[in-house]
Regions:
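Chalcogenol-based redox active-site neighborhoods
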Residues: 1-160
Length: 160
């Protein structure tokens, strides 16, 4: 289980950020913190509430935010457009990211075996996890104030 103080596991997937392109986490690490917001499924109620909250309440220029789900990139492209999400979405249908971060949830009752557990990680410019939040159930959203504080701390350290 990836936790605070660990080196952030690298992974490859597809990034939807206007176009669909290859994504490698290590290539995105640098001067500012990276936030990975894992969510179970595009177009579902709680996931959309979370992504819209991040869109509306987490508009800051001192970090890079990515939503991460096991959805296919073309589905994420439609989702990103429909909900006007300004941040990139990472499609992880091969489960590399959710396995690396150990945020795997089964939704067998919905006919889907493996999805991302709702979770948020803040990674500093050195690639170290500085914040981790895991949902206790799929309907739970993160504490956005705590996330904001965690990014403030990581951004302040990066600026020092």
């Amino acid at each position: 289980m990836t936790t605070v103080g660990d080196d952030a596991p690298d992974f490859t997937a597809s990034l939807v950020d206007g176009d669909i392109e290859p994504f490698r986490l290590d290539d995105r690490l640098g001067d500012e913190p990276v936030v990975l917001a894992f969510f179970p499924a595009a177009f579902s109620n709680t996931c959309t509430d979370e992504m819209e909250a991040l869109r509306d309440e987490f508009d800051r220029g001192d970090c890079t935010l990515f939503g991460v789900s096991t959805d296919l990139p073309h589905a994420l492209a439609a989702y990103r457009t429909q909900y006007e999400l300004p941040f990139g979405l990472v499609g992880d249908p091969d489960h590399r990211a959710i396995e690396a971060y150990d945020v795997i949830e089964d939704f067998e009752h919905y006919g889907v075996e493996t999805v991302a557990q709702r979770a948020v990680f803040v990674i500093d410019g050195d690639g170290v996890v500085t914040y981790r939040w895991l949902a206790e159930h799929s309907g739970q959203e993160p504490d956005y104030d705590a996330l904001d504080e965690a990014v403030d701390e990581a951004a302040d350290e990066a600026a020092a």
